[in-house]
Amino acid sequence: MTDATAMPLRSFLFTPANHPRRVEKVFEVGADAVILDLEDAVAVSEKAGARQCVVDAFSARPNSGTQYYVRVNSIDTPYCEEDIKATVGPWLHGVVLPKVESGSCLNRAEQWLAAAEAACGMTLGQLDLMPIIETAAGVESAKEIATTNSRIRRMAFGGGDYTLDLNYEWNADEAVLAYARAKLSHAARLGNLEPPIDTVVLQIRDDERFLQSARYGKQFGFGGKLCIHPSQVPLTHDVF
């Protein structure tokens, strides 16, 4: 696989790994990176099958020009280690780790990634590890997270869980996200990382709100957007 640093990544498009029709379509919309999701969108009873879907989907499409990521379950679940073991291979560019709150979270994931790379005959450190910062604890630990592991190339921000964690009202002006965005931007700079990737926008039929959110993120030094609908990809590219 091509090194994930070879191109700037602006759009990261999520789709549930356990929905074959959605998986087929996600490769057709021109996203810079595709993230097949094993976390929020996949029921516990379907996680094992979804892991195989990740491998099948990515290994069938080598050298597409799109970067391939998998979002595993968080480090404090019983699923994360097996998610990594089952999906890592030469078809993958990186792993998205949700709900990261400290450097120790990354160190545990690093051990599992290194073992999986070795088992597949891959170069140690080949895979990107992208933490999503989406809690108050994660935001306050952003500098530690950004400087803990050389595998990290960029961080991402999850506004949904962040605002739930703090009981904030997430309105269109996104004032409640300003502090977290600033913290992540500062941390990325101090860690010599690429610009962070901004939060999803849940209102998938409101293009103007998405564009406004993307512009706010860009003002804070972010380099792209997490997307949850194909229509958000070209909007992301319009801003970044």
Q: Could you say what each language-model-derived stretch is?
A:
Residues 1-240:
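Expand to "…catalyze enediolate/carbanion chemistry for C-C bond making/breaking, isomerization
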